[in-house]
Amino acid sequence: MNLLIMGLPGAGKGTQAAKIVETFELIHISTGDMFRAAMANQTEMGVLAKSYIDKGDLVPDEVTNGIVKERLAQADIKEKGFLLDGYPRTIEQAHALDETLEALGLTLDGVINIEVDPASLIDRLSGRIINKKTGETFHKIFNPPVGDYKEEDFYQREDDKPETVKRRLDVNIAQGEPIIKHYRQAGIVRDIDGNKDISEVFADIKKVIENLK
C-alpha cells in the first residue's frame, strides 16, 4: 500500500500521518526526514542538497526529486509500502514522482486529501500568543491563559499574525490545487472532512484506506 497525504497547514496532516503509519505499518516518508537522512548518510543527492542549504539557497527540484528517488529505491519500501508526506509540493514535482514510481515499478494507491475550511485554519494558526515575561505559549481558542492577564501581556510572532497566515495558506492552495487535480484525473483522491474531531477524522481515513486494499 503506497499512499500520499495532503492538506493545508493546520489541517492536522502530521497528526493523521502518524496514526496512519502506526496502524497500517507503513514507512513514513516526510521531506524533512528524507533530507536529514540523505545528508547524514552523505548520499550523492544528500551532498548536493547540503551544498545548497549551507549557502542559504533553495534546493532545486531536481535535487529534491533525486532524494525522493533514492529513498523510494530502498528495499524496505517494496516490503512495507509508504506514506508520502510533504512531497510533492508543486505540479512539476508530481510529474517527477510519477516518473520515479514508474521507473521503480511502484504505484501510488491513494491520495488522502484532508479538507478544512481555510477561514477556520486562519483561526487555528493565528491563535498562538506568547507571554512577554515568561515566554509561555498559549492559544486564544485551544489553550487560553488562565488568570489575571491583559491583552498587552502577550505578543504574536510575525509568522502567527492572521495576515501572514492567510498569505501562507493562499500560496499552499495555489500550489496544491493543480496537484489534487492531477491525482483526481487518475481517480485516486479520497477527500476527508478535516473539520471533525481528530479521532473521527482518523476513523474516516481508516475506512478509506481499508477500501483501497
Swiss-Prot record:
Region (LID): 127-160
Protein localization: Cytoplasm
Pathway membership: Purine metabolism; AMP biosynthesis via salvage pathway; AMP from ADP: step 1/1
UniProt region (NMP), positions on chain: 30-59
MF GO annotations: adenylate kinase activity; ATP binding
Principal location listed in the UniProt entry: cytoplasm
Pfam families: ADK
GO cellular-component term (any): cytoplasm
Binding site residues for AMP: 31, 36, 57-59, 86-89, 93, 157, 168
Keywords: ATP-binding, Cytoplasm, Kinase, Nucleotide biosynthesis, Nucleotide-binding, Transferase
Catalytic activity, as annotated: AMP + ATP = 2 ADP
Purpose of the protein: Catalyzes the reversible transfer of the terminal phosphate group between ATP and AMP. Plays an important role in cellular energy homeostasis and in adenine nucleotide metabolism.
Homology family: Belongs to the adenylate kinase family.
Protein name per the record: Adenylate kinase
Source organism (scientific name): Streptococcus equi subsp. zooepidemicus (strain H70)
Gene: adk
